[in-house]
Amino acid sequence: MTMKVKLLTTSVALALSMTAFSSNAVDFSGYFRSGVGVSQDGDMQTGNQSLVGRLGNESDTYTEIGIGQEVYNKDGKVFYVDSMFSMQSNGSNDYESTATVCDFDKKQCSEDATFALRQFNVKAKGLISAAPDAVVWAGKRFYQRHDLHIIDTKYWNISGAGAGIENLKAGPGAFSLAWIRSDGNDIDNSIVDNDLNVNFLDLRYAGWAPWEGAWTEAGVSYAMPNPTDEQKATGGKYDPENGVMLTAEMSQYFAGSGINEKLVLQYANKGLAQNMISQGGGWYDVWQLTDDAKGYRVILTGDIPLGDKFSVNHVFTYGKGEKLQEWHDNTELFSAVARGGYAWTDIMKTLVEAGTYESTKTWTSGAEDKSSGQKYTLAQAWSAGPSMFARPEIRVFASYLKDGEGESFNGGEDDSTWNFGVQAEAWW
């Protein structure tokens, strides 16, 4: 009888708590893209989105679904629970699940779709009386990611499970401090424990405006590999040195013209150096020997309106990395992507995107590996508004892709190909 009473009490308490939580609206957010397309040789042939642009250069189905709710708000104390799941597939058929399909004769397995837990965290505001606007958080989250949408990459992205404090006001801006875990997995097969624990300390200051229309942010992302005793004894890639990535950026809005430009300067060393030439945002390279590695990157991105109906978004990147692996001398990367849009009506527009890149990898022997390519896309789009980034959007596109150094298309027979398709994209 006592057990029944306890169970009943617990059930009532849970029901009451759920009723209390449901009095606050649930925040539903997300992103998705999906579509269909063909090329001159089978289905769509895509690649190098972060170098030549993503418009007309994506063939997958991808979605992120976020659900969050404020669960407590009293006397200036606020608690918020946030979550997000993602799914990705190649969009090849109707039923795409996580079921694994295996060909045991070939000892190969594949999955239709992959699902992932991307965010699950608690944010609390008002816990620090001296800093009532500061937010204390813990859990798994996207941490203040800095995005370049038209090339689908984040140049500053220290995300994962962790904890931190955001928006600590100081002077004209605010500090944010976080401890985030981002391990390197499956380094090699030399030992059983081949996953290396890596922790980041991330410190940022944002909000200083040196003059009208300007806005700045700067930060230090410090990576600390944390090997086990077995990994230390193994040495090499299992016992790398701490690395740092420094980021400084300035945004400028030019009143009257509507132009927005952002300049980003970055420096990184050790396992973080490869981000400077891979369009990465902060992952630590545990698969190469990087104790002598260093690199830097310059990014210029922005929006340029040309009249009431036409605008251009652009991303220019130059990066250089040295000693990124054994026998490596240096790698240089240049990438330029621009997307223009002309709004015919409030819901219809024409889009043009052009992108080019060139990468040169030099070895200590003097040998060079080069890669380069271009992409050109024309699209007709219908969206919920005239701006270039109004969403949802449905677009019909045609793309031409060119390999500047080899024959990577149409089964390795051609240095170019074309794609034609229809895609939808939305965020909310």
Curated annotation (Swiss-Prot):
Transmembrane segments: none annotated. The keyword Protease does not apply. The record marks 31, 62, 427 as: Greasy slide, important in sugar transport. It catalyses: beta-maltose(in) = beta-maltose(out). It is a multi-pass membrane protein. It is found in: Cell outer membrane. One of its GO terms (molecular function) is maltodextrin transmembrane transporter activity. Keywords: Cell outer membrane, Ion transport, Membrane, Porin, Signal, Sugar transport, Transmembrane, Transmembrane beta strand, Transport. The keyword Nucleotide-binding does not apply. GO terms for biological process: monoatomic ion transport. GO terms for cellular component: cell outer membrane; pore complex. Residues 1-25 form the signal peptide. InterPro entries: G_neg_Bact_CarbUptk_Porin, Maltoporin, Porin_LamB, Porin_LamB_sf. Involved in the transport of maltose and maltodextrins. Belongs to the porin LamB (TC 1.B.3) family. NCBIfam families: PRK09360.1. This is Maltoporin 1. It comes from Aeromonas salmonicida (strain A449).
